[in-house]
Swiss-Prot record:
HAMAP family: Ribosomal_eL31. This is Large ribosomal subunit protein eL31. One of its GO terms (biological process) is cytoplasmic translation. It comes from the Archaea. Belongs to the eukaryotic ribosomal protein eL31 family. GO terms for cellular component: cytosolic large ribosomal subunit. Pfam families: Ribosomal_L31e (PF01198). CDD domains: Ribosomal_L31e. The gene is rpl31e. GO terms for molecular function: structural constituent of ribosome. InterPro entries: Ribosomal_eL31 (IPR000054), Ribosomal_eL31_CS (IPR020052), Ribosomal_eL31_dom_sf (IPR023621). It comes from Haloquadratum walsbyi (strain DSM 16790 / HBSQ001).
Length: 92
């Protein structure tokens, strides 16, 4: 695997926009915002982004009504079968 086939970055995803959503939908909307933000920054389709379950647990840790206002995410892009895939997990 050459260096051009693998790229890893730590990205801060702003989640302030979830405050405009009804309270019972905020954590779900935050997950959608994370996926959209990573798709934009890695220039891939949203369906090519795989979110780690620990990222889901981090967003939902304070309940569905109070997700974090921003989140640091470690994302890695690699080529799989000629297609770019992005895997994301919370950065520590």
């Amino acid at each position: 695997m050459s260096t051009s086939d693998f790229e890893e970055r730590v990205v801060t995803v702003p989640l302030r926009d979830v405050s405009a959503v009804p309270t019972h939908e905020r954590a779900g909307r935050a997950m959608t915002l994370i996926r959209e933000h990573l798709a934009q920054h890695f220039r891939v389709d949203e369906s090519d982004i795989r979110l780690d379950p620990s990222l889901n647990e981090t967003v939902w840790a304070r309940g569905s009504q109070n997700p974090p206002s921003k989140l640091r995410v470690r994302a890695a892009r690699f080529d799989e079968d000629g297609e770019s895939i992005v895997e994301a997990e919370p950065a520590e």
